[in-house]
């Protein structure tokens, strides 16, 4: 952190993304992540972003000529759990990890914001997490890919218009095949739209339709 701070100066935000649980044999667990979180906060980092899994260690052996892909083992599964994961599903799956780290950081006398992510696909879930004090910031990847205008729609009071991610991991499947990543909720829509960027095979649009045009 200190080396990075010297490089960018005092007016630049520096945070860290780390795992609340590595989900691999002999890997770090929440107890380790809590310790690291407190040390990161004491060091002066501007935010702590908590994730889970995504390690290469238990990934399946790739086919000849293909790269190792991390989301094929249990650790990778926990990084991007689909809607059929288990009885809990992907919804807010990592929140307890962020909550434990935030609690320890606050008890250590630090106010460093803690970011949580992972299966947070609705405004209600995001707000409830913040109200309970389990995190300070909500991050969303798949939900933002499903609807890049998610935040604008909610702010405008048009939450019913949000194109909600259903966590089938269609996007992850494309990534695993090393194809351009899109969302199945919009990548076949209005393909004849003038000037729309398309995938290499021309079958998918690469950018979601603009909300104003819908």
Where are the language model's segments positioned?
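Flavin-dependent oxidoreductase catalytic cores
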Residues: 1-214
């Amino acid at each position: 952190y200190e080396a990075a701070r010297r490089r960018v100066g005092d007016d630049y935000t520096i945070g860290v993304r780390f795992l609340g649980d590595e989900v691999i044999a002999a890997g770090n667990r929440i107890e380790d992540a809590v310790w690291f979180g407190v040390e990161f906060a004491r060091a002066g980092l501007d935010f702590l972003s908590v994730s889970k899994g995504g390690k290469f260690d238990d990934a399946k052996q790739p086919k000849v000529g293909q790269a190792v892909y991390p989301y094929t083992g249990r650790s990778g599964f926990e990084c991007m759990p689909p809607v059929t994961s288990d009885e809990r599903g992907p919804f807010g799956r990592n929140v307890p990890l962020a909550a434990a780290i935030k609690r320890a950081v606050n008890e250590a006398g630090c106010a460093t914001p803690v970011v949580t992510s992972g299966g947070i696909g609705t405004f209600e879930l995001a707000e409830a997490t913040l109200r309970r004090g389990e995190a300070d910031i909500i991050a969303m990847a798949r939900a933002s890919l499903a609807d890049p205008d998610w935040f604008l729609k909610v702010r405008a009071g048009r939450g019913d218009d949000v194109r909600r991610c259903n966590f089938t991991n269609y996007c992850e499947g494309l990534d695993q095949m090393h194809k351009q990543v899109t969302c199945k909720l919009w990548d076949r829509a209005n393909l004849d739209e003038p000037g729309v960027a398309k995938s290499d095979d021309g079958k998918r649009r690469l950018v979601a339709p603009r909300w104003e045009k819908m």
